[in-house]
Amino acid sequence: MGKCSALMIFLSSSLLLVLQTLHVVNAVKCFGNSFNGNSSTFAQNRQKLFPTLADKVIINDGFYNASLGQDPDKVYALVSCARGYDQDACYNCVQSLTQNTLTDCRSRRDSFIWGGNDDVTCLVRSSNQSTFGSVQLKPPVVWPSPDTIESSKNITLFKQQWEEMVNRTLEAATKAEGSSVLKYYKAEKAGFTEFPDVYMLMQCTPDLSSRDCKQCLGDCVMYFRKDYMGRKGGMASLPSCYFRWDLYSFHNAFDNVTRVPAPPPRPHAQEKESCITVKKGKSIGYGGIIAIVVVFTFINLLVFIGFIKVYARRGKLNNVGSAEYSDSDGQFMLRFDLGMIVMATDDFSSENTLGQGGFGTVYKGTFPNGQEVAVKRLTKGSGQGDMEFKNEVSLLTRLQHKNLVKLLGFCNEGDEEILVYEFVPNSSLDHFIFDEDKRSLLTWEVRFRIIEGIARGLLYLHEDSQLKIIHRDLKASNILLDAEMNPKVADFGTARLFDSDETRAETKRIAGTRGYMAPEYLNHGQISAKSDVYSFGVMLLEMISGERNNSFEGEGLAAFAWKRWVEGKPEIIIDPFLIENPRNEIIKLIQIGLLCVQENSTKRPTMSSVIIWLGSETIIIPLPKAPAFTWIRSQSESGAMSLSDDVFTELSCR
């Protein structure tokens, strides 16, 4: 029975992965000017033209360009199938994609969709302007594999071999050999040191020049590489080209492809012992040489240590600013000298104060080499004790992502516990979003970029990093903004490390900020990635409204937003500075925010779903239900505690 259950789980998981992959590959992108639905002349012309495309592409050697109607409602369509296509497979592929376009892009004039089935890839592209012979490099569609490369793999070696494969495939795909459908296409199969086989496919529409094709494919690779280099495969496409790679064969594209073998291992030293002659008739083998070198090195090391001790006694090392330190897991970081930090901050001068948090004060510092840093000096008795200090040092040392603040090092001399971060010039998000004057600087484009960046940072913590981390204190004051207003998630003192297969944990030690804490965490100490999703939802609603979560007496922002949503008036909560921006896009974010603050944690999305929703104009997003109103219960239970008070307590045993 156990084996049968395990088999059913495996088959269900495999089927789900296949369905996800097919959905990913067949994602239509709608863009450009809008029109008035199916009743418009443009829509009617498109509905007449599209049903003819599948037949036409077959009799035109796999590539067909057509138009129908008169300007300004003229419809242009371009259809293509890949090299070596099966006619039935090509026909079915084009039929499916034209239907997807008609369904998903009812009110947009421009669209493209690269898709496929088991036997072929194909493209359906349409516009109200001629696209033939012109490369189009926006908008991109990028879909990564949901699986990440295991930390046990040699990632550096994998990236090197992956880049080499990209270059080979790109060069071959853009040689423009053959007739229409044979041009600008290359499928390659290669062995990697860390994986048995890697499959890669690149394709452009055959109406382009070789130069345009190379630029287009290069951009596709760039879009994938930028955010998803650690994934086990993925796809990136533009209206004029298509790039996909995976660890398994796809689209029947590799049956007749010769496998490029994995590069040979680096040559080792010859096992045959070589000799060095020292006297006639005598020689020393490598074993003897190694013994001599070891003894010589050991003597030099003793001499060096002696010099260090002598100079240390004379005080010659007092001006050393930092030293490398290794924790119990072998992770290296910098331990800064307290005197150097005191000098950098002008003895923690109030003029250098950047901000005040629940656990300490942050100062700006400048090292003698001109490097600017942010110095967080923990307040004694603040609640962030040794455990939280060591936790933040240990976690941030292992994390590297453009949307996470970078820890440069630490200092723990005497009673002082200090963290040294990269300096982020624009302070934290709360200084902008809740300031009447500065909020106007947060345009719709800037806010969207901040929201998306925070989401990507959380996705990295939850799924993409070598560790699995729950932040537990996500709020606007813990989001720093760099010079270009890109967000960086900060303050990992209360973060919780999960095992790779762990999805949920319980704690008696509750730490965070009331109003941002998920109900199951605040009331029962239950922690999961969905706890961070809840906090993200509250913060997203703050970004849209420009109001603090505690600005609405007795109910909170989520409750207020939900009431307006039910009334059909979600625009009431929109910040007046955003009124002139695309209403549908802003309301979509309100919908996502409400989904993130659902009372039942299983009803909240994952951060990967949030990323997909943010980047798609066509995916149907679920409708939210009433969100959690934990602050109403919490206020009645704990008296006058504010919605924004820091919480650092322990649940009593029951």
Curated annotation (Swiss-Prot):
Residues 309-654 are cytoplasmic. ATP binds at L354, G355, Q356, G357, G358, F359, G360, T361, V362, K376. Keywords: ATP-binding, Glycoprotein, Kinase, Membrane, Nucleotide-binding, Phosphoprotein, Receptor, Repeat, Serine/threonine-protein kinase, Signal, Transferase, Transmembrane, Transmembrane helix. The chain crosses the membrane at residues 288-308. Glycans are attached at N38, N65, N128, N154, N167, N256. It is an enzyme of class 2 (transferase). The keyword Lyase does not apply. Residues 348-619 form the Protein kinase domain. Residues 28-131, 143-250 form the Gnk2-homologous domain. Its EC number is 2.7.11.-. Residues 28-287 are extracellular. The modification Phosphothreonine is found at T513. Pfam families: Pkinase, Stress-antifung. InterPro entries: GNK2 (IPR002902), GNK2_sf (IPR038408), Kinase-like_dom_sf (IPR011009), Prot_kinase_dom (IPR000719), Protein_kinase_ATP_BS (IPR017441), Ser/Thr_kinase_AS (IPR008271). The modification Phosphoserine is found at S477. SMART domains: S_TKc (SM00220). The modification Phosphotyrosine is found at Y421, Y521. It is a single-pass membrane protein. This is Cysteine-rich receptor-like protein kinase 40. It comes from Arabidopsis thaliana (Mouse-ear cress). The gene is CRK40.
